[in-house]
């Protein structure tokens, strides 16, 4: 920064710092970026770090750009399964699509409920009986002991208390990988 560069290139600048110092330095780098208005290319394999520091992110796989966008765009509207799972955790399951107007019907597992997903959430044209891959973020799911037509039976096999939230790993069906759920402590208090 002493030489007033046009572009600042940073290759894993926080890689060897402990977690607390990394969080502090993320904020400091962001502050410097804003104060100097300098274009910065920040290479990191830490998705949380990228989302905290970057205005626009590029997700690469084997040297190919998969998606460019804001952290919100990449997290909430990923272009494909790779980006979805790279930017945060995503639970996936395969299903056969059915249609009902402007929604796609997807059955979860053998005993599971039918999800109704808006066609605007699909990344490609989906027709009835197409094989589809459906993804759901851990924070959009919850654990309950009550059975209903909207629940998926499963067995909790790992519980991790991680400060502000609890992460559950749940086996739901032999055909589906264990499902991850994250429930914040505030919602458990209610």
Indicate where each model-derived feature is located.
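ABC ATPase nucleotide-binding domains
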Residues: 1-85
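Short low-complexity stretches enriched in small and charged residues
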Residues: 49-53, 61-64, 88-91, 125-126, ...
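Short acidic/glycine-rich beta-turn/loop cap or linker motifs at sensory/regulatory domain boundaries
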Residues: 62, 96-101
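Short, electropositive, low-hydrophobicity segments enriched in small/polar residues
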Residues: 67, 73, 92, 167-168
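Non-catalytic connector elements of ABC transporters
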Residues: 90, 99-190
């Amino acid at each position: 920064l002493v030489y007033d560069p046009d572009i600042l290139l940073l290759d894993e600048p926080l890689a060897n710092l402990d977690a607390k110092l990394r969080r502090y330095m993320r904020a400091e780098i962001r502050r410097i970026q804003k104060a100097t208005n300098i274009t910065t290319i920040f290479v990191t394999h830490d998705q949380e770090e990228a989302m905290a520091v970057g205005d626009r992110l590029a997700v690469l796989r084997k040297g190919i750009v998969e998606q460019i966008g804001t952290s919100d765009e990449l997290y909430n509207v990923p272009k494909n399964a790779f980006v979805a799972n790279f930017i945060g955790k995503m639970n996936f399951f395969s299903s056969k699509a059915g249609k009902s107007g402007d929604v796609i019907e997807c059955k979860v597992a053998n005993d599971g409920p039918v999800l109704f997903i808006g066609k605007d959430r699909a990344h490609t044209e989906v027709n009835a009986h197409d094989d589809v891959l459906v993804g759901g973020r851990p924070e959009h799911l919850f654990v309950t002991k009550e059975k209903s037509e909207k629940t998926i039976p499963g067995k909790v096999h790992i519980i991790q208390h991680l400060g502000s939230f609890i992460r559950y790993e749940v086996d739901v069906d032999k055909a589906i990988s264990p499902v991850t759920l994250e429930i914040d402590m505030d919602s458990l208090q209610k």
